[in-house]
Amino acid sequence: MDHVKLVNDPIDIAHIHQLLADEGCGASSVFVGTTRDNFQGKKVVSLAYEAYDSMALKEMNKICSDLRSKWPDLKHIVIYHRLGTVPVCEASVVIAASSPHRSEALESVSFAIDQLKTRVPIWKKEIYEGDYDSEWKENKESIRPKKSQSAFNYAACPCKVEESHDVPRTLVQIRVNDAELTKRLECFVNRKRDEINSQNVIDFKSSFVNSDKDFSDSCARTQSTIIKQEQSNSHLKVRRVNNRCGPQQMEMRPNYELELNKLMGSRDGQTDPSKEMRKSLPNSRLQAIESYMCLTTDNEENIFSRIKKVENRLLQLESISPEYRHFTKLEPSSMEPPPPKKIRKKSYSAQELSAFIQKIKDGSEFT
């Protein structure tokens, strides 16, 4: 059975032996890693361990699987690692294995500790006594990416660069000293601050011109007239406008097209074509249309391309402004019956009706 765990409390070695106990095992190998009290002449007080818990446990379980694939006779495997602060002489890691024979137990534990130092993401920091700063230590067995052999050695190729502080005057926009530049920046910041303050007074403070109270020391925080709206990030009140009268509502107005036709018809004849437009009738009429459509006029351009521009402009206006629908008269579909023609009925007087009835009686209409 595999026992893998990251603990924050001291590791109980007796409990480890209980986990290894098995009637079919004749050997148990236990490795205990402890904190030593010195490193390169410096007094070590304790070690601090940190780990990426989920990945560390995953790698420790993989190590157990590798051990069982190499030594199938192993019965129990224990890998305990401590996290947090570990004082001197206390156990930081315990790796143990039990098997029927001693060779498998000894070799598996040695292999497991090497793999633990190499693969498991656990970091160690040594805390020293005195004025020495604590240091993070890396395992010599850890996998590190090898440095590229083709990396360029800049130290072997010194480059001499001539430093020149002379800048052409054509590249300098502001030719003042530091004091003058600082003064200009301060003036700019103060002016912008005054503009913001004055705008805040206009937006947030009410006018007290007719009030007898003295509000010379008031501010927008204490005398604000605008309150933040609920469920809104803005202090200004926002309303949704329902435009009931406008170009988009023309279908709801029965007399809209009639009124618009009258309005547009009143503008006919107001344009006064110039002398150049009167040179030729087609050119003058086309220029009048281009002028009305706000299109650029070029007399040297082909007339067909100019007509094409006018058509494109009309299509654009029809797509964005429904007011231009009154210019278009859609022809009825051939499948639909033509609308009935309006015939004005003739009005007859009483004398005409009497004469018509008398003719019917006399039979003069049928002769």
Swiss-Prot record:
Pathway: Cofactor biosynthesis; molybdopterin biosynthesis. GO terms for cellular component: ATAC complex; cytosol; molybdopterin synthase complex; polytene chromosome. It comes from the Eukaryota. Catalytic subunit of the molybdopterin synthase complex, a complex that catalyzes the conversion of precursor Z into molybdopterin. Acts by mediating the incorporation of 2 sulfur atoms from thiocarboxylated Mocs2A into precursor Z to generate a dithiolene group. One of its GO terms (molecular function) is molybdopterin synthase activity. It is found in: Cytoplasm. Heterotetramer; composed of 2 small (Mocs2A) and 2 large (Mocs2B) subunits. InterPro entries: MoaE_sf, MOCS2B_euk, Mopterin_biosynth_MoaE. Its main location: cytoplasm. It catalyses: 2 [molybdopterin-synthase sulfur-carrier protein]-C-terminal-Gly-aminoethanethioate + cyclic pyranopterin phosphate + H2O = molybdopterin + 2 [molybdopterin-synthase sulfur-carrier protein]-C-terminal Gly-Gly + 2 H(+). This protein is produced by a bicistronic gene which also produces the small subunit (Mocs2A). Keywords: Cytoplasm, Molybdenum cofactor biosynthesis, Transferase. SUPFAM superfamilies: Molybdopterin synthase subunit MoaE. The keyword Cytoplasm applies. This is Molybdopterin synthase catalytic subunit. The lineage of its organism: Eukaryota, Metazoa, Ecdysozoa, Arthropoda, Hexapoda. Its EC number is 2.8.1.12. GO terms for biological process: chromatin remodeling; Mo-molybdopterin cofactor biosynthetic process. Substrate binds at residues 101-102, 117, 124-126. The keyword Lipid biosynthesis does not apply. Belongs to the MoaE family. MOCS2B subfamily. It is an enzyme of class 2 (transferase). It holds the Pfam family MoaE.
